[in-house]
A protein has these predicted regions:
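Membrane-interface helix-loop junctions and terminal tails of multi-pass membrane proteins
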Residues: 1-236
């Protein structure tokens, strides 16, 4: 069962029978973390060093990757298996921006979901690091991440992608349709944002501000797109 909340009932809690912490069911938090773990491991994957070249040419992705029919299938199955989990940051941000922005419980619930996505991604990265030998974060980014800078076209792309993805997500009520939308617009919606955050936090947080700002601002732009789509739909 793939649960999609409409803007009118976006703050309705998922009844899974666990204890409440910060307005969010503990089982729901574990569900979100487990889903993020599975998707990070099986879909986002891990870049391993093959010893056939330098750190750029001699690497191999150990995972499905965010492209193709297998990625769509994996995400679709994940949303059905982990019913109620958002799994990806853009989905959570769309629910935030189309819900009641004055509802503190909703903010706590969605904030906890974002945190659990990072925790789940971090656990998957730890496991994969033990399973495979590969380049370190320092090898991949020897000079660190570039400072984040506002770009109007990037923001506009995120808003447009968010509007389209929310229409797909809220109107089709179908995990496969949402998965197709995410894969088609993965770069614009920041689908791998939680894993990027997890990787940065596990590597001394040297690039905290660039990665954090990109994670937040991409999410906000996607959420604004979802809000825009909702307002347009309400006034047609």
């Amino acid at each position: 069962i793939f649960i999609i909340y409409s803007p009118d009932n976006a703050k309705a809690p998922t009844k899974v029978g666990g204890k409440k912490i910060m307005g969010m069911d503990t089982k729901d938090m574990m569900n979100e973390m487990g889903a993020a773990f599975a998707v990070t491991w099986l879909v986002f994957g891990y870049t391993a060093y093959t010893m056939d070249g330098d750190v750029v040419t001699g690497t191999e992705l150990m995972g499905i990757g965010m492209s193709g029919i297998m990625a769509v299938a994996a995400l679709g199955v994940a949303w059905m298996a982990f019913a109620g989990a958002h799994i990806l940051p853009p989905v959570t941000w769309m629910h935030i921006m189309t819900g009641d922005l004055g509802d503190t419980d909703a903010w706590a619930t969605n904030g906890a979901k974002l945190a659990m996505q990072v925790v789940g991604g971090a656990l998957a990265l730890i496991m994969m690091a033990e399973m495979y030998d590969g380049p370190s974060y320092a090898d991949a980014w020897p000079n660190g991440q570039e400072d984040w800078a506002f770009d109007a076209m990037t923001m506009a792309g995120g808003i447009a992608a968010g509007a389209i993805l929310w229409c797909i997500h809220s109107k089709t009520d179908n995990a496969w349709a949402t998965a197709i939308g995410v894969i088609a617009m993965g770069t614009y919606v920041g689908a791998e944002g939680s894993t990027d955050m997890a990787s940065m936090l596990m590597n001394d947080m040297d690039d905290l501000m660039p990665v954090l700002l990109d994670w937040v601002m991409t999410g906000v732009s996607v959420g604004l797109g979802a809000l825009l789509a909702t307002k347009i739909d309400e006034n047609l």
